[in-house]
Amino acid sequence: MERIKELRDLMSQSRTREILTKTTVDHMAIIKKYTSGRQEKNPALRMKWMMAMKYPITADKRIMEMIPERNEQGQTLWSKTNDAGSDRVMVSPLAVTWWNRNGPTTSAVHYPKIYKTYFEKVERLKHGTFGPVHFRNQVKIRRRVDINPGHADLSAKEAQDVIMEVVFPNEVGARILTSESQLTITKEKKEELQDCKISPLMVAYMLERELVRKTRFLPVAGGTSSVYIEVLHLTQGTCWEQMYTPGGEVRNDDVDQSLIIAARNIVRRATVSADPLASLLEMCHSTQIGGIRMVDILRQNPTEEQAVDICKAAMGLRISSSFSFGGFTFKRTSGSSVKREEEVLTGNLQTLKIRVHEGYEEFTMVGRRATAILRKATRRLIQLIVSGRDEQSIAEAIIVAMVFSQEDCMIKAVRGDLNFVNRANQRLNPMHQLLRHFQKDAKVLFQNWGIEPIDNVMGMIGILPDMTPSTEMSMRGVRVSKMGVDEYSSTERVVVSIDRFLRVRDQRGNVLLSPEEVSETQGTEKLTITYSSSMMWEVNGPESVLVNTYQWIIRNWETVKIQWSQNPTMLYNKMEFEPFQSLVPKAARGQYSGFVRTLFQQMRDVLGTFDTVQIIKLLPFAAAPPKQSRMQFSSLTVNVRGSGMRILVRGNSPVFNYNKATKRLTVLGKDAGALTEDPDEGTAGVESAVLRGFLILGKEDRRYGPALSINELSNLAKGEKANVLIGQGDVVLVMKRKRDSSILTDSQTATKRIRMAIN
């Protein structure tokens, strides 16, 4: 109470009031701001003020043993007086200098590993090239970009578990490392960071940079991959740009780029198969990108691209709620509509059934090279404001918007019949028919659209049907703007459904994506894409089909061998041999197949003529429907490298070359794998060892069922008989011994008996 009374007295004096009101800090609010709460309100000032004091730093008492009281110049490094309110020592900034010069040194080996992302950035900048600066208007649009080059693609939760496991392995708390990438990274980092003296918190921060994708919504004109974004401040201003070529690539950009290529290839291939959805899933599950399963990448990677989103939808993952049409991403920003089927007549009097959107709606349209704002009513374009990099890009956006508007004058501008088909030879839906038609030639569309005089609005000009700019006239409702339209910033994802023809719909039934929207652009992937599915072998051309077919036979040789001998028809019908047929000249397919099948039958009938290498070599030819003919061939032709190349029926050729010494097969000079068994060992060694405990009774006896592989023999009961397939593809009848005593003699007898049974 005393104090308050005293303050009241002070306040009653006019001088006090004058001091408090005339000086700058006159507001209780300001005094409060700087004195309440733990948060420092003016860190820079506080730092200057602290550093002006003699002992601004506090340290643990142990510092007194580690640092002398005075340095070589006799300046005091720490004060014996304790820090008020704690038992720490007051220390001078000079102590830091002393410590840096004379303190203990530690191994620097961990620094490049911990600060990996920084070291790599320095390298990229060192090797990057900066070109000239150009002054021009920059059309920047905000896009969601990756600002953190060189990261893995773990979710925040996954990364947190990895970081806890690496940095604080003994802390309590449930951590379940499930994904392959989590386990690999954890193992790698634990090894790298043994005996690391850097503070765990710092290590944790740096690991986070390496593991998690950080995105920001930034204005960009130009490259959007993370190695460009890290130098955004150097390459584009408001009215200037500087050319820049990065001095290195980072895996995350490569993953994004390769993922898009893989997804496009898979969607294109799935479209032409009997069951597109099933095929797409099979391919996604059997494909690897840079050694990581594609499905794992899809689950973690936020890339939004039409083909990638179709794959995600097929896997039941959520995707963005925007929809795609004509390669533009549409996001409705206001209004609503109901859909109704309507029949319309084209300029060629062809009837089209279109789903008309009734109601007023506004959309943003964002493409790679142009963006726009579209306002439309039922079958009417009210306003379109476009901005783009060049005339061509602007025209593309205008065509898409005009078709999307469903205006009558657009439909009447169609000349000729609409009969565009997709890769599977199915007719496209009417909206895509119209789109393709005008993408080929939009002259009539633009001429018939109509023009209007325009007002002079800042930053906007008109555009004429021949795509020239104008300040007086413009196509009806269409204007070109200097400013870009920002991409949709939200990262919200919605649940979608997908039908067997890969059309993706939201829960209201609106089509968001379909295979027609997948770009036909071909690119070369930065990371190796391994398509294990035979459906994808043809993606990389004939050579890839050839190599993959033979690799598949070698990988599955154990089962192929048994089928070859027991159930050849089933083997010949395997889908893995389908792509190969396109390499065999059409006229020769049936004859080759008949010839090879006859040859194989002779091998089965005449014991001892089984030839592993020859079977592998000729097997793919037997898959075509055979023509019966007496023709014999010494070589078979396959069409690769733009011409026919020969595979010799007996012996090696550049196409198919088996090296006896290394037991490896090369196809067109590419390694196709190794044969695990030796085709030339005869029947000694392996079989006699494996057949110990069995008595060989003679040639195959069909009454005892299909031939077992040597591995399956162990399931026989004592005294039971079975046919067994031995290494050279010959089948003999054996019986499991009743007594174990005579096992030793079996290996000698087996060798003799196999020879007799065969001969």
From Swiss-Prot:
Gene Ontology BP terms: 7-methylguanosine mRNA capping; cap snatching; DNA-templated transcription; symbiont-mediated suppression of host cytoplasmic pattern recognition receptor signaling pathway via inhibition of MAVS activity; symbiont-mediated suppression of host gene expression; symbiont-mediated suppression of host mRNA transcription via inhibition of RNA polymerase II activity; viral RNA genome replication
Pfam families cross-referenced by the UniProt entry: Flu_PB2_1st (PF20947), Flu_PB2_2nd (PF20948), Flu_PB2_3rd (PF20949), Flu_PB2_4th (PF20950), Flu_PB2_5th (PF00604), Flu_PB2_6th (PF20951), Flu_PB2_7th (PF20952)
Main location: virion
Key word Ion transport present: no
Keywords: Cap snatching, Eukaryotic host gene expression shutoff by virus, Eukaryotic host transcription shutoff by virus, Host gene expression shutoff by virus, Host mitochondrion, Host nucleus, Host-virus interaction, Inhibition of host innate immune response by virus, Inhibition of host MAVS by virus, Inhibition of host RLR pathway by virus, Inhibition of host RNA polymerase II by virus, mRNA capping, mRNA processing, Viral immunoevasion, Viral transcription, Virion
UniProt GO molecular function: RNA binding; RNA-directed RNA polymerase activity
GO CC, one annotated term: host cell mitochondrion
Gene3D superfamilies for the chain: Polymerase Basic Protein 2, C-terminal domain (3.30.30.90)
InterPro entries: Flu_PB2_2nd, Flu_PB2_6th, Flu_PB2_C, Flu_PB2_CAP-bd, Flu_PB2_middle, Flu_PB2_N, INV_PB2, PB2_helical
Span of the annotated motif Nuclear localization signal: 736-739
Function: Plays an essential role in transcription initiation and cap-stealing mechanism, in which cellular capped pre-mRNAs are used to generate primers for viral transcription. Recognizes and binds the 7-methylguanosine-containing cap of the target pre-RNA which is subsequently cleaved after 10-13 nucleotides by the viral protein PA. Plays a role in the initiation of the viral genome replication and modulates the activity of the ribonucleoprotein (RNP) complex.
Similarity comment: Belongs to the influenza viruses PB2 family.
Quaternary data: Influenza RNA polymerase is composed of three subunits: PB1, PB2 and PA. Interacts (via N-terminus) with PB1 (via C-terminus). Interacts with nucleoprotein NP (via N-terminus). Interacts (via N-terminus) with host MAVS (via N-terminus); this interaction inhibits host innate immune response.
Name the record gives this protein: Polymerase basic protein 2
Species, as recorded: Influenza A virus (strain A/Brevig Mission/1/1918 H1N1)
Top-level taxonomy: Viruses, Riboviria, Orthornavirae, Negarnaviricota, Polyploviricotina
